[in-house]
């Protein structure tokens, strides 16, 4: 069986991707900070889908712990066929008053970790001429919304670059750019979401299913939901002052 490694695998998009891939017969390497919860997910999926599930407890802001995941990805005796760079978090406060250490941790998780993990897994994929990488970005990557948007913009552009660089191979790279998705993400970030209209929410299973279809089809940018396809299209063609105002308006509503 092929093996998939998923970061941030205990909840939200990561957990949904783990379930989808297990259902398709992939063995799993699940990565997260919460080991008891991680083992619970691994046990549940192993039992339900008759697959093997490894766990790696790792805080991706810590270089030594990130290195453990890199080492597993580089182990070609147990190759990783699919890498899902999903781990992440958001910050509620404006950059002007936020904790600088938290801002740095956000960059460590959203930028440094996916870059290093992709670099670790790609040599094996290139040697086998097979593999897929999904970088979980955001529609926030198309607007101006602080460090989070900037980091997600990196992921989107990085994915586009790798997709193009590897176009003559059988390796697929895709950026998943969801909008507001019903997960623990916003509650954990203590963001105010009560005023968001119901039609702006997307279901996590549908988000992941569309992403995986796009990966299989070799498509580089996946934006689930008609509302976010429209929003991203507007963001790409609108004058930048309009995009900047939209970004700051959305951010301020979450505080």
Name the predicted role of every residue range.
Residues 24-40:
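Conserved glycine-rich Rossmann-like NAD(P)H-binding loop of the short-chain dehydrogenase/reductase
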Residues 10-11:
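Conserved glycine-rich cofactor-binding loop
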Residues 138:
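Residue(s) in the substrate-gating loop at a strand-loop-helix junction
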Residues 163-230:
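SDR active-site lid
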Residues 94-107:
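Substrate-binding pocket helix/loop in short-chain dehydrogenase/reductase
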Residues 118, 151-154:
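Active-site helix of classical SDR
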Residues 35-36, 57-68, 100:
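The beta1-alpha1 cofactor-binding region of Rossmann-like NAD(H)/NADP(H)-dependent oxidoreductases
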């Amino acid at each position: 069986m092929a093996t998939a490694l998923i970061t941030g695998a205990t909840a939200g998009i990561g957990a949904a991707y783990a379930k989808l891939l297990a259902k398709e017969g992939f063995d799993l390497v699940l990565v997260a900070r919460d080991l008891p919860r991680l083992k619970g997910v691994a046990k549940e999926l192993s039992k339900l889908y008759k697959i093997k599930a490894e766990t790696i407890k790792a805080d991706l802001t810590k270089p030594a712990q990130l290195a453990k995941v890199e080492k597993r990805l580089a182990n070609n005796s147990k190759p990783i066929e699919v890498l899902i760079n999903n781990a992440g978090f958001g910050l509620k406060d404006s950059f002007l008053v936020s904790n600088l250490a938290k801002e740095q941790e956000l960059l460590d998780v959203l930028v440094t970790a996916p870059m290093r993990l992709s670099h670790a897994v790609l040599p094996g994929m290139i040697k086998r001429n097979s593999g897929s990488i999904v970088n979980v970005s955001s529609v926030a990557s198309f607007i101006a919304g602080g460090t989070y948007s900037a980091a997600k913009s990196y992921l989107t552009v990085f994915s586009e670059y790798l997709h193009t660089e590897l176009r003559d191979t059988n390796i697929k790279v895709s950026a998943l750019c969801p909008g507001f998705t019903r997960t623990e993400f916003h509650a954990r970030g203590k963001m105010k979401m009560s005023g968001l209209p119901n039609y702006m929410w997307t279901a996590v299973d549908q988000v992941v299913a569309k992403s995986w279809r796009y990966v299989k089809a070799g498509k580089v940018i996946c934006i689930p939901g008609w509302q976010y396809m429209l929003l991203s299209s507007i963001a790409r063609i609108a004058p930048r002052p309009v995009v900047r105002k939209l970004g700051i308006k959305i951010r301020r509503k979450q505080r």
